[in-house]
Amino acid sequence: MATAAMTKVFVLLFLVAACYLPAHAAAAECDCATDTAGRDKAQALRLKVIAIFCILAGSTVGAALPSLGGRFPAIQPETDVFLSVKAFAGGVILATGLVHILPAAFEALSSPCLVGGPWKRFPFAGMVAMVSAIGTLIVDTVATGYFHRTDAKRKAAAVADEPADDLEASDEHSHGHAHGMSVMSVAPAGEEDLVRHRVISQVLELGVVVHSLIIGMSLGASDFPSTVRPLVPALTFHQFFEGIGLGGCIVQAKFRVRSVVTMALFFSLTTPAGIVVGIGISSVYDANSPTALVVQGLLEAAAAGILVYMALVDILAEDFMKTKVQRRGRLQLAMNVALLLGAGLMSMIAIWA
C-alpha cells in the first residue's frame, strides 16, 4: 500500500512539472535577453539521446549495486564495508542538497527576470527548504508512530485471543524467530529498525525524484551543445552516486522484490523521462520566464530540505551514533573518510553540473 501511494505521488509530481512549466513559460515575457550564439538543435539532440542512455545506465547500476552486493557477505547490511559505503552515500546526498539544489533554488528565486512580486523581498528558498525539512521530520515520526501503534494493537489482540497455557511457550518460541521480509514477522528490536528504514527509503526517494525530474527537464530543454556536453558525464556520475545512496536505504528496508524493482525503476527512469519532456518542450520553454523560475525554485528548495534532513538525521547520524561504530576507532575513521570523500566528489561535480 505504501509503495502504491508513493507511486501516485511521483506520477503527480511528474505531471505537474511537465504540464505546468511549459504551458506558462512561453506566454511569459522577460527583459532578460536570450543569447542565441552557439545554438545547434541537431547536435544538441544527439547529445541528449546519448545522455538518456548514459544517465539511465548510471542510475540503474548505482541503484542496483547495494541490492546485488547483498549476495556478498562483506557488503551485506551492518558490515564495516556497508557502513562505510552508506557514509559515502550520505555525503553524496548531503552535497546534492546543499551544493547542487539549494543554490539553484536561491538563484532561480532571486533572478533579475522576476520583476515584481515578493520573491526578492524575502528568502523564500531558505524558508521553503526549512519547512520541507520540518515537514519531513513530521512525516518521518508520524508514519513510524502509526506503524508502531498498529503493530501494538495487533499484538495486544493476538495475546488476548491466545489461551493462557500457551503464553509461556509462545513467548519462548518468539525469541527464536529470524528476521523476515515482512514488518510483522520480525522480532521487536528488528521490527523497529525495519519500520524506520522503510519510511526513510520512501521519503528519500521522493526528494531524489523531484530533483532528478528537474535536472532532466533542464538538460532536455537546452539547445546549446556547449551546455549539454559537459552535463552528460557529470549527471551520469551524479545519478550513479545518488543511486548508491538510495539503493543502500532500500536494501535496509527489506522490501519485497517487486517493491525494490519499482522504486529502483522510478529513480532510474525519472531523469531520462525528464530529458524526453524537455526535448518536447524545448521550442516553447523559456527558462527565464517568471513562472518557470518560481516553480523550479520552489521545487528545488523543497527537495533540498528533504535531502539535507534525510542525509544528516536518517542516514549519517543514525549510523555514526551506533555503539558498534563508537567503540571502534578504525571503523569510525573509515566512515568519516568515506563521508568526506562522498561529499567532496559530489561537490566537484557541481563545477560542470
UniProtKB/Swiss-Prot annotation:
One Pfam family in the UniProt entry: Zip
Keywords on record: Cell membrane, Ion transport, Membrane, Signal, Transmembrane, Transmembrane helix, Transport, Zinc, Zinc transport
Phenotype of the disrupted gene, per the record: No visible phenotype, but increased tolerance to an excess of zinc.
Subcellular location: Cell membrane
Gene Ontology cellular-component annotations: plasma membrane
Database matches in InterPro entries: ZIP, Zn/Fe_permease_fun/pln
Membrane topology per record: Multi-pass membrane protein
Signal peptide start and end residues: 1-27
Residues in compartment: Extracellular: 28-48, 108-121, 220-230, 282-292
Transmembrane feature ranges: 49-69, 87-107, 122-142, 199-219, 231-251, 261-281, 293-313, 333-353
GO molecular function: zinc ion transmembrane transporter activity
Cytoplasmic compartment residues: 70-86, 143-198, 252-260, 314-332
GO BP annotations, alphabetical order: zinc ion transmembrane transport; zinc ion transport
Domain of life: Eukaryota
Statement: the UniProt record of this protein carries the keyword Ion transport: yes
Family the entry assigns: Belongs to the ZIP transporter (TC 2.A.5) family.
Note: Plants overexpressing ZIP5 show decreased zinc concentration in shoots, increased concentration in roots, and are sensitive to an excess of zinc.
NCBIfam families: zip (TIGR00820)
Function: Zinc transporter that mediates zinc uptake from the rhizosphere and may be responsible for the translocation of zinc within the plant.
Protein name: Zinc transporter 5
Organism field: Oryza sativa subsp. japonica (Rice)
